[in-house]
Amino acid sequence: MENNNSLTIIKKADPKTKSNGEAFQIAFDSMDKIKTMLTQQNDKEKLVLKKLMIEMSINNSLLNELLTSFSTRVNIIDVEIIVLESQISTIERLTLENKKEIQSNDQEKIKEISSMIDKLIDPLLKNIDGLTNKFTEKNVNDEELKKKIDVFFENSKKLFQGIDKAEKSQFLTKFSSLFGVISGFLGIGSVTAIGATEAVGVTSLIAVGATSLSVVAPICAPVLLTFGCLVGAFISFYKQSVARDKKLKTLKSLLSYYMENIELISQVTDETTKLIYHELKEKVLEFKKLEANLKIDFDLSPIKDQFKSITSKQNLIKDKVEEIANYQLDLIQECQKLKKKSLKNKTINKK
């Protein structure tokens, strides 16, 4: 099985550890950070975040599709589990009813019982394989969903490229500010610090306004005063540039959270289920091998416990995905409120 980050997270969330919810803690932590960003930024910064959030609202429908796809599979698995539990109960009853004959070493009886158990175990193994296939098989809807996820990642890459370009443009702003100090000091005219506007991929990422620095050194003005004013202007421009750098890094971080969440949710259900059924099959095969050699007391409780683990993990995943989807919806609604507030402010300003 492919060893990726999601699978590593799932293995950490093994039933042997204290918590089964570790796989989704990353998603919740990142969502908390997003909400904090929305509540702590000033209005202009909120609008920048709002634009990105609105453009990424496709995530919500993506999450819902993932949830629907998973729920459909879970319903199929629930039915199959009932059948498997029935088979296990039959094997358990058969072994208990014939325990005395087995212990008495009645070879004919043992052979007869082993044959009956084999006839029950073989379909059990087949059903486990079928169960895994039903959960992981690809259908038309899955392929469409995969295409949407691929488009999301492609758009995200374009956004990152836009952020990188905007970050590089900060160098121009700093350089032009420095050049403004020098040219102003020499009294040779004025210079404009050029801002950067990036519109790449699915969103207009960030617009850095154009700021003009016009300094003409008066012939009669003291040189020292002129230089002091220019240095002050340069410091102001530099601070603005640093603030923009910080904002761009915040946006890049926010986009990373989204990408991690979608990747985690789209992989964690399949990978978790594969892991569970692989362990289950190993236990049944081990049981069959020991049963053939009559070296165990026909205790099927570990396998039954494994089914309980499957059910609880399925419910955990389902609940967490629903919770994340609702959380995402709350964030989008908060962004829409910001958008309405922005439009209202624009209307007031026009008046």
Curated annotation (Swiss-Prot):
Q: Keywords for this entry?
A: Glycoprotein, Membrane, Transmembrane, Transmembrane helix
Biological source species: Dictyostelium discoideum (Social amoeba)
Sites carrying a glycan are 4, 59, 345
- What GO CC annotations are associated with the protein? membrane
* Location(s) in or outside the cell: Membrane
Task: List the protein's name.
Answer: Transmembrane protein DDB_G0272716
The organism's taxonomic lineage, starting at the top: Eukaryota, Amoebozoa, Evosea, Eumycetozoa, Dictyostelia
Residue ranges annotated as transmembrane are: 175-195, 215-235
Q: Which cysteines are joined by disulfide bonds?
A: none
Name the membrane topology term: Multi-pass membrane protein
